[in-house]
Amino acid sequence: MPKPILLICDDEEGIRESFKLILEDQYDLKFAHNGVDALEQLKSINPKAMLLDIKMPKVHGMEILKQIKKSNPSLPVIIVTGYQSVEMAQEAIKNGASDYIPKPFESKQILKAIAAVTK
């Protein structure tokens, strides 16, 4: 049986590598380096969930979240970001995020969040 697809959108290579180490055994990982790339990839893949950073070049992650929720409202999007404010978390949830995980994160946080939205 093929692995479920996860789309990971983060501009930091080190973070993408961390996700790869944590998730590659269980998921078919697709990576986007910015929001424009993520939106383009979503035209051709159907991920089970998405991990999305907020602070990125070209298009802010919150804008990407809004666009994704307009075109694919059922796609679970987990925000993983360096922003640790309650206000930012509330805005993300209000805009359709399934979960909000501040960086730095632990492996178990990521695995638990993905498991919760992909049941």
What are the residue ranges of the model-derived segments?
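Acidic, metal-coordinating helix/loop segments flanking the phosphotransfer/catalytic sites
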Residues: 31-49
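Receiver (REC) domain active-site loop signature in two-component systems and cognate sites
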Residues: 56
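Short amphipathic alpha-helix used as the core "switch/output" element in two-component signaling
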Residues: 40, 62-72, 91
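C-terminal output helix
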Residues: 87, 105-115
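Two-component/phosphorelay signaling modules centered on CheY-like receiver
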Residues: 13-30
